[in-house]
C-alpha cells in the first residue's frame, strides 16, 4: 500500500518494477550481459543527464524552458521497497534512488539501501500530459535548439527498439491481428 500526498492532486500512475522482456509468463528486466554490452551507451546517456524517467525534464532543459513542477510525497506502508514507485515523468531523479551515472539500469528506479526506502519526495511536472504535448511541438518546430537532447533521445530510442519489449513468438502472433 502506498500513501500519496500531492501539492496539487491529479491522476498519477506510479510504477515500481518495469519489465523489458516478456517470457510468456512474466516480465523480466534485461539480463546483466545485455546491459553490460551497452555500458558505453548507458554511461554516456546518464552522464549527459538523460534517464528515461526524466525525459520530459531533459527535453525542457534542451529547449531552455523552465517547467512548472510540484512535489509528491510517497509513503510506502506495505509495498515492496526494492524500487522507488514513480510516475513516468520525473523532473529529477529522487535522492533515494540507487540510480547513478555509472548504473547499468535503463528502465528501473532501484531504491537505495539494503531494505529500500519507505518515504521519499518526487518532483514531477505540474501537468505532464500537457508538458509532453507542448515539448513535442517545440521539438518539431525548433529541433536545432535541442540537438543534445535529440541525440541522446535518438540513441536511447534505438536501444529500446533493439532490446526492450521483446515478446515470445506465440504472444507476438496473438497480438498481430490487433
What is each model feature region?
Residues 1-178:
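Helix-boundary/low-complexity linker signature
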Amino acid at each position: 500500500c502506498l500513501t500519496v500526498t500531492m501539492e496539487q492532486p491529479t491522476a498519477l500512475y506510479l510504477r515500481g518494477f518495469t519489465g523489458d522482456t516478456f517470457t510468456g509468463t512474466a516480465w523480466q528486466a534485461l539480463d546483466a550481459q545485455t546491459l553490460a554490452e551497452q555500458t558505453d551507451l548507458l554511461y554516456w546517456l546518464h552522464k549527459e543527464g538523460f534517464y528515461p524517467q526524466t525525459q520530459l525534464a531533459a527535453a525542457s532543459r534542451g529547449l531552455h524552458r523552465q517547467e512548472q513542477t510540484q512535489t509528491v510525497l510517497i509513503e510506502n506502508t506495505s509495498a515492496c521497497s526494492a524500487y522507488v514507485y514513480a510516475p513516468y515523468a520525473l523532473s529529477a531523479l529522487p535522492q533515494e534512488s540507487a540510480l547513478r551515472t555509472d548504473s547499468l539500469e535503463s528502465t528501473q528506479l532501484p531504491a537505495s539501501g539494503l531494505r529500500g526506502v519507505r518515504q521519499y519526495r518526487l518532483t514531477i511536472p505540474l501537468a505532464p500530459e500537457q508538458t509532453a504535448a507542448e515539448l513535442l511541438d517545440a521539438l518539431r518546430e525548433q529541433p536545432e535548439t535541442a540537438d543534445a537532447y535529440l541525440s541522446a533521445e535518438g540513441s536511447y530510442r534505438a536501444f529500446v527498439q533493439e532490446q526492450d519489449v521483446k515478446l515470445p513468438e506465440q504472444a507476438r502472433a496473438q497480438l498481430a491481428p490487433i
